[in-house]
Each structure stands twice: as C-alpha cells, then as structure tokens.
Regions:
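Carbohydrate-associated surface elements
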Residues: 40, 171, 191-194
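Membrane-proximal helix-turn-helix segments that form the acceptor-binding/catalytic region
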Residues: 108-111, 115-119, 145-165
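Conserved donor-binding/catalytic core segment of Leloir-type glycosyltransferases
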Residues: 212-228, 233-237, 249
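A short, well-ordered alpha-helix in the C-terminal region of glycosyltransferases
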Residues: 350-353, 357, 364-378
Length: 400
C-alpha cells in the first residue's frame, strides 16, 4: 500500500521516535510505501527529504508544541491546513496514495486529509486520540462559542470524511455515537494506545545513581498539560511528606510542569523530585525500576481518555494508580486487566487509601505489574497496533 501519514510532530532523525513514527516504521518494515508530512517551525520554506527511510515533507508552520497561549496555539493549528496544502501542491501533487493515516490532535488537519482523499482517491484512517473541542471546553481552555463551533465543524467533517475511526477505548466509541447521533461517520473501531518498548535492562545501580536506592518511588511521566491535574500529585506528596521512604519522581514536559515545580517549592514538598525529559528508551528502562506509576486526569474532563503514559507503565511491568475523571472507562480497563487501581480525581482520601494498599503490599505490586504487562503484550504493542489497523484497512478495501 501507498500510505501518507499526517503528523503534528515528528522528532528529528537523531531523536527517539514517538508512537506514530514507530507505527509508520511498522508499515515500512512490512513492505508498504510510506510518506510523512509534518510541521517544521525552524525553516521558512517547506522541503522534502529522506528521514528514517521515509519520504518526509517538512511543512513550514508556526509553533504548536509547548505554547502556553491558547490563542497562539489555536491560530497555529488553524493555519496548518493552509501550509499543508501549499506543501502538498509543491511536492506531492502527482503522488498517489491508497490510505491517509492521521491522528488527532489536531482535528484541524481533517480538511486537508479530505482534500488529499479526493485528489488521490484514497481511504482515510483517523486515529482518534483526543476528542476536540469537547475536551478543552470541559476543562476551561476554550470559552468562545464561535471558536467552539468552528472546531466542532472541523471535527464533524473529519468524522464524516474518515473511512475508519480508530478509538482508544470502548468509551470513546460510545461517546462519538452519543455526541453525533445523526452524523454518518466512518466505521468506529477499537485501537488501543501503543508503545514500542525496548528490551528492558535490569540495572540495579539506577536507583543508587539517583539517590533512590532505599526509596519507594512513584513515577509521573509524560505530558504535564492542562488536562492533567497537578494538584493530585501535590496532594499525595504533601500527605506522605512525613514518610521519608516515599518519593514522587516527575519526568515530564508540558505547560503545567512549571506550576507543579512552583507548588512544590511553595509547600516545601521535598519529596517531589524532578528529572529532565529523556529519550523514550531510557525513560522506559528507568520506569521498570520504580515501584508505582501515577496517572492524573483533570476530573472536569468530559470525555473518556486513556493516557499513553499508562501503556508505558504496563510495558515496564509496574502497577498503576489512576486519579481520573469519573466518566472515563479507562478506570474499568486497568481494573479488569488487574493492572492497578483507580479513583475519581476529586476523591483525594480514596486515592490515599489505594496508595497505602499498594505501598504496603509488595506481592500486590508484583501481581498488578505482571497483569499489566500481559495486557500490554496482548493489546498495546506497536506490532499489535499495526496488525489491528492493517486488518481493518484490508477488510474495508474488500468491502467486508
């Protein structure tokens, strides 16, 4: 197949790949022709080249990553469609594709995906990893109803244009059906988050190097944006401050990291340790040496969401404690898989009770970690993601 990936971000060749680059690599390794279009904020002109074995079109664009101003980020995302069309006409106007694969965010690129679909007579696979604008509206990041309407129209067109919509949980699938009952969308299918895990190296010195040799280490890793409730981490840290054995290790980037650092300083939470963000392979190997993985989602979130950091915890074989929005079936997933416990983010006392249970029972931690790893191996490897998608795509092409 000839496949075009539309990505919001693509790490430079000398950096570790992310989940979408790893997925594209699976397509390439299985004999498919892969082209990637991704933004470039450094150069003033778009350009095409070879990276990681792919044909890559780097599209001149405005910065969308790590932007604190929602207005600047919104404007940058809104202009992506224009810049992508410009680069497509310059470099790919005669190219033919069988499938277009695009993850969300950003839903604002769905118009461009529809444009390529018409020009190339291709099929469109939408990987739904965030549901806009409902998600940002529910946590107060979007207030203007005109902007909401604009984004909602973009979302509707994307759902209508897609031939297949890969949802990260059954709750996601139900939410789309419930929000758009009269909308004729693409086929809704289940596609869990995935991560390409390295061969984990058991490094018994890693704790000693970090000064954590005798500590109970709870890790919060990945993104720290507005969708994560940093107060949940701070609350647990404050509660367990008298216990010198417990450390909360934060390896994250995002607009809320500075706020958590400020809270930790103001409240003298010396048990919150911050490490710089690191390559994924190094991060996953470090993850395998900690005792507990933490998930925190803003309890005001109105949409079901399954954070990718939880998949990393499962891959590393560590138990999970999730403080999440109550309308989220992610809690059900980790509970039924046996990978951990969950509670509503607003129920801080229950979070403490669950933390205590995991902290005081090493056998429970081992049992949860093992169960999580089994779930990961069966559902969340990049190989499983590829096989799931390619089977769905082939069935769709065959009219099944």
């Amino acid at each position: 197949m000839r496949v075009l990936f539309l990505l919001l971000d693509m790490p430079a060749p000398d950096k570790s790949g992310d989940m979408y680059v790893h997925l594209a690599e699976q397509f390439l390794q299985n004999g498919h022709s892969v082209t990637i279009m991704a933004p470039d904020v450094v150069h003033k002109l778009s350009f095409v080249g070879q990276e990681r074995g792919f044909r890559v079109v780097r599209v001149r664009s405005k910065e969308t990553q790590g932007v604190k101003s929602m207005y600047k980020k919104g404007f940058a995302l809104a202009t992506l469609d224009y810049y992508f069309k410009e680069a497509y006409r310059k470099f790919l106007k005669d190219a033919q594709f069988d499938w277009i694969i695009m993850p969300t965010p950003p839903i604002t690129l769905s118009g461009f995906a529809s444009y390529v679909k018409r020009r190339s007579h291709a099929k469109f696979y939408l990987i739904l990893r965030d549901i806009h604008p409902q998600s940002v509206w529910s946590i107060g990041l979007l207030h203007n109803r005109v902007e909401y309407w604009f984004l909602d129209q973009k979302a509707r067109k994307g759902y209508q244009s897609a031939d297949i919509i890969g949802c990260m949980s059954p709750g996601n699938m139900f939410y789309i059906k419930d929000q758009y009952p009269t909308l004729k969308t693409g086929e809704l299918t289940l596609l869990y988050n995935w991560v390409k895990a390295p061969e984990f190296v058991t490094d018994k010195t890693v704790r000693a190097r970090l000064g954590l040799e005798e500590k109970f280490v709870s890790l919060f890793g990945g993104n720290l944006g507005k969708g994560q409730r940093v107060e949940n981490i701070a609350y647990l840290a404050k509660h367990y401050l008298p216990d010198e054995n417990i450390v909360f290790l934060v390896i994250a980037k995002g607009v809320e990291k500075e706020r958590l650092q400020r809270i930790a300083k103001e409240q003298n939470l010396t048990n919150i340790w911050f490490l710089d963000f690191m390559p994924q392979a190094d991060y996953l190997n470090l993850t395998s040496s900690v005792d507990l993985g933490l998930v925190s989602i803003n309890e005001s979130y109105s949409v079901p969401t399954c954070p990718s950091k939880a998949v990393s915890y499962m891959a590393a074989g560590i138990p999970i404690l999730a403080m999440i929005n109550p309308d989220n079936d992610y809690g059900q997933i980790i509970e039924e898989s046996g990978a951990g416990y969950w509670t509503a983010g607003s129920d801080k006392q229950h979070a403490v009770e669950l933390f205590d249970m995991i902290y005081k029972d090493s056998n429970l931690r081992k049992k949860m970690g093992k169960a999580g790893k089994v779930f990961y191996q069966q559902n969340c490897t990049v190989e499983v993601a590829y096989e799931t998608m390619i089977n769905q795509m082939e069935k769709h092409q065959n009219g099944e």
